[in-house]
């Protein structure tokens, strides 16, 4: 199962009193927009009990065109990585163990 932003908004409506569906959608959208803009400005994000979004600079490296085998340079770029917290890893592992 995949959890969507719309489903997150529905969960907010169910669990938080006096939150309308439109308010919940806006809250979810604002949350993700803040994550996007923070990462775009070059800052990392640490969410306690969940994990860290970090930026990593990858240098230029050689690659190959799969059809022709020709060597093609892959340009340097910045990527976003996510590292789950130990608490999140433990929760996932515990849930997985219960399912078996």
Curated annotation (Swiss-Prot):
Query: Which GO BP annotation is one of this protein's?
Result: DNA recombination
Keyword Transcription regulation recorded = yes
Gene3D superfamilies the record matches: IHF-like DNA-binding proteins
This entry carries the following GO cellular component terms, namely: cytosol
Reading the lineage from the top rank, the first entry is Bacteria
Whom does it interact with, and what assembly results?
Heterodimer of an alpha and a beta chain.
The family annotation for this protein states: Belongs to the bacterial histone-like protein family.
Quote the HAMAP family the UniProt record gives: IHF_alpha
Protein function: This protein is one of the two subunits of integration host factor, a specific DNA-binding protein that functions in genetic recombination as well as in transcriptional and translational control.
State the name under which the record lists this protein.
Integration host factor subunit alpha
């Amino acid at each position: 199962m995949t959890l969507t932003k719309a489903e997150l908004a529905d969960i907010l409506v169910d669990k938080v009193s006096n939150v309308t569906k439109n308010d919940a959608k806006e809250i979810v959208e604002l949350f993700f927009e803040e994550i996007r803009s923070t990462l775009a400005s070059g800052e990392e994000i640490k969410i306690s009990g969940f994990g860290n979004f970090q930026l990593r600079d990858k240098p230029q490296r050689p690659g190959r065109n799969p059809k022709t085998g020709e060597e093609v340079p892959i340009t340097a770029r910045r990527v976003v990585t996510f590292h789950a917290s130990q608490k999140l890893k433990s929760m996932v592992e515990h849930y997985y163990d219960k399912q078996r």
